[in-house]
Amino acid sequence: MGFLSPMHPCRPPTQRRMAAGNHSTVTEFILKGLTKRADLQLPLFLLFLGIYLVTIVGNLGMITLICLNSQLHTPMYYFLSNLSLMDLCYSSVITPKMLVNFVSEKNIISYAGCMSQLYFFLVFVIAECYMLTVMAYDRYVAICHPLLYNIIMSHHTCLLLVAVVYAIGLIGSTIETGLMLKLPYCEHLISHYFCDILPLMKLSCSSTYDVEMTVFFSAGFNIIVTSLTVLVSYTFILSSILGISTTEGRSKAFSTCSSHLAAVGMFYGSTAFMYLKPSTISSLTQENVASVFYTTVIPMLNPLIYSLRNKEVKAAVQKTLRGKLF
């Protein structure tokens, strides 16, 4: 996602310039993967294959369910269907290649393939960051301004918000991937299981300071804008919920937001651990665990989180199943 700390260690510029003068063009990279232990390759393959299958079924199921049931044709579920699409897409950018690597002797990825993986991963992760923010704003309008909800969150507004979210993802990814394309690489072993910015930057044989600072401020803008919007939205939401006189009303209002809060907490928590810290604080194993969590586990969990406590989704599932069975 590009939340890169400027404290990230790199080789001195003099050493990098010396290397840059002698390096040959890298045409492919080798992904180190999650582990070198041969006895763990098959169990990990089966584990992540299961996670990926659940991710596909869950997110495609959520999108299909929302499309087939007219009672779910509301702004909240329109945004949720796009969130499911993003989860499905960025998981599909990472997981299939990771599964192949578990059963391959050499985890090779071409230069073009690596940069393409980075580009599309960033598109959907940055877009998801802003989509969660849009969903927080939607809940704010629904709870704090219920009488104006249909006017504020009109069909045109929803389409515009989603278009802006994808545009931000495309622009952010283009900038960050473009910076990575300009770097010369003289090493080919990526200490990670996919092509991410931090591991790739370590392979450059020129100074990465300008790239680091550009990516850091770009990512800083993204995370500050989105996190502040979510924080402000839920501050007003909590204030409105506490002002509801009936216990039933408070419970219903809070239940509509609890799922989103859980998704926001998991996503921002894991990405912040990965990118908003000096790399010396955590080990490679800890970074891999955090990275696996937000690239593979969160896309699997989001459909479950939004459906388990949602009466409308449960009712839509029952209606769809009855329609198929009878």
Swiss-Prot record:
Q: Could you list the residue ranges that cross the membrane?
A: 46-66, 78-100, 117-137, 151-171, 223-243, 261-281, 288-308
Alphabetical keyword list: Cell membrane, Disulfide bond, G-protein coupled receptor, Glycoprotein, Membrane, Olfaction, Receptor, Sensory transduction, Transducer, Transmembrane, Transmembrane helix
Q: Which example biological process does GO assign this protein?
A: G protein-coupled receptor signaling pathway
Tagged with keyword Disulfide bond = yes
Stretches in topological domain Extracellular: 1-45, 101-116, 172-222, 282-287
Enumerate the glycosylated residues. N22
Q: Name one GO cellular component term.
A: plasma membrane
Q: Which domain of life is it from?
A: Eukaryota
How would you describe this protein's topology in the membrane? Multi-pass membrane protein
State the similarity comment.
Belongs to the G-protein coupled receptor 1 family.
Protein task: Odorant receptor.
Name of the featured protein? Olfactory receptor 8A1
Q: Which organism is it from?
A: Homo sapiens
